[in-house]
Amino acid sequence: MSDRKYPLERVRNIGIIAHIDAGKTTTTERILYLTKRTHKIGNIDDGTTVMDWMEQEKARGITITSVATSAYWNGHHLNVIDTPGHVDFTVEVERSLRVLDGGVVVFDGVAGVEAQSETVWRQASRYGVPRICFINKMDRTGANYERTLGMITQRLKAKCLPLQIPIGCAETFRGSCDLLDFQCYGMDNSPEEPAETFDLPDADKERAVKFRNTMIERLAEEDDEVMEAYLAGEELPVEKLKAAIRRVCLANKAIPIFCGTSLRNKGVKRLLDAVCDYLPSPVDIPAIKGTAPKTGEPMERHASDTEPFSALAFKIVSDPFVGRLVYFRIYSGNVSAGSGVYNSTRGERERIGRLIRMHANDREEIEYADAGEIVASLGLRNTFTGDTLCDQSAPILLESIKFPEPVINLAIEPKTRSDQDKMTEGLQKLAEEDPTFKVKFDDETGQTVIYGMGELHLDVLVSRLLSEFKVNASVGKPRVAYREAITAHAKAQGKFVRQSGGRGQYGDVTIEVEPRERGAGYEFVDNVKGGAVPRNFLMAAEAGIRETLETGVYAGYPMVDVKVTAVDGSYHDVDSNENAFKMAGSMAIKAAVAKAKPILLEPIMKLEAVTPEEYMGDVIGDFNSRRGQIISVEPNPETTVITGNVPLAESFGYTTDLRSVTKGRATFSMEFESYREMPGELANQVVEAAGKK
């Protein structure tokens, strides 16, 4: 067993999450500097950040992948993951939150709660991740602490527990006042020096007392010990208040709120203290649940070095220098470099080659890793995102990670045969890294088609393919991933008979189809009575039905949300076989769908545009011209936030058009909302175009 440098109670696995441009990466860079992981502060605008190490990240000034690093603060070991804020890379947030224990949510003090803020908040809530919030950019013109608190309460339905208030605002922002003891903090200074302190100005005392009283009242509502003291009129000491804040934070009953400006080095040291004081260690979270691989019986593992080894692989990276890196979170036990582990997801033994603690793109080789750690390994050849690694003598299968289906695709063609080989290898590695990136080969057109979550997502992946894998290829325009559905009940028979000398082919099945609720998926029911069709033939027919639905019946797009019930059929003792019934199933579903009033579904995107007020009319006009549906128009100081739904097919080129109508002064974010029925005339055009291919 290994000797721990830091007890489990002093380990923090945290993610820095937020909307794009809220200051996540800048905050993380300050954390690395203050914890002495770096000796100078990286800058996004200069492309010198440690965490944004990919060429595309430096060029675009955004975070694309989630990056892990280790840091140390006040006797605590922090595993910090900086995640992307752009919705096209939401998969990175999803997989990070699955393996983290706590989150630091960064908000732009000017913009407040933005579209992707809501998305990452929902993701964190789904995984039950305790959070603290950092209202950043308090030095910017238009920053408003109280308004942002109100937006967190109203839009995110969170119970705010402000533990600081800003002293000054915009160009007069001096720092923040801690409401527990009214100590004020200014510049963070160097790692060795304590943060600058100053006395609470007289002009802010009444406001600070009011905020503190509100904080105590909210804390009392959620914590019995504070409530008893509050009702008795007693003043609890700071340490007891901090213990109560930790309890309500871990229980997700309230969210501690802090403020500052990462760029100007104010507030990050206190934020680091808060991570240690209020966010959970691995022992504070419930035991990880799983099942026995063979029996499916429920099992669990506690965060302990003495329990059997269990871990979840959450990220694959193709490193150009060392090869295939697998990131995993250890939930129990420990593991050594060179040791054997069991992949219970795939039923295969694997060997841990080199064991690595990552610092963004730098690697630190280690001999062993303990429960609660996030590390990477070389040598795991058959382990993929969402796989469980464990001790073979005590196997467990942990819940995997669920990812959304891609909604956009484009064709890509290599220019030479050697490019074909490089492209195949590159696409395979990129698909291993990103579960929302899919690759399919179209047999009819001979084209390779790639699928992703949005234009930027595919743009970045194509850029990586061309630059990292040196592929010379032609790239088509983005296309919409439509879906098919039915709107009525129908019944049809599929009968496949072929006689050409010798043994013939015979398969016969009758099915009924009916629509299901949107998102319910495909269901097959066997309702054939009296053994009219043997079980193995019926399963072959079902395989034919399923494959036909996957390739499309109406317009060549996958058909979803349909219930298929097999009701009758017949077979021949000599001529029937599984292939004949597979053909019969395919024929039956095609005939049934034709009668069931098929429709086309199109992906609808939720779009949020932030524009100066003078361009609001132009932005709304452009939005309406795209078959958009306005949900809300929210005026803010200096800007207006327009939220609505727009079909993905109408959103291509929106970046350029929005820049044009607002002279580059508006921003927007867009995420997948749902699939909805496409208007008849437009659907007919898509169906006709599919028929001409």
Curated annotation (Swiss-Prot):
Subcellular location: Cytoplasm
Keyword Protein biosynthesis: yes
Source species: Dehalococcoides mccartyi (strain ATCC BAA-2266 / KCTC 15142 / 195)
Annotated function: Catalyzes the GTP-dependent ribosomal translocation step during translation elongation. During this step, the ribosome changes from the pre-translocational (PRE) to the post-translocational (POST) state as the newly formed A-site-bound peptidyl-tRNA and P-site-bound deacylated tRNA move to the P and E sites, respectively. Catalyzes the coordinated movement of the two tRNA molecules, the mRNA and conformational changes in the ribosome.
Name recorded for this polypeptide: Elongation factor G
Gene Ontology MF term list: GTP binding; GTPase activity; translation elongation factor activity
Family: Belongs to the TRAFAC class translation factor GTPase superfamily. Classic translation factor GTPase family. EF-G/EF-2 subfamily.
Annotated residues for binding of GTP: 18-25, 82-86, 136-139
Residues covered by the tr-type G domain: 9-283
Keyword Metal-binding on entry: no
GO cellular-component term (any): cytoplasm
Biological process annotations from GO: ribosome disassembly
PROSITE patterns for this protein: G_TR_2
Keywords (A to Z) from UniProt: Cytoplasm, Elongation factor, GTP-binding, Nucleotide-binding, Protein biosynthesis
Gene: fusA
Source organism phylogeny: Bacteria, Bacillati, Chloroflexota, Dehalococcoidia, Dehalococcoidales
Matches recorded under Pfam families: EF-G_D2 (PF22042), EFG_C (PF00679), EFG_III (PF14492), EFG_IV (PF03764), GTP_EFTU (PF00009)
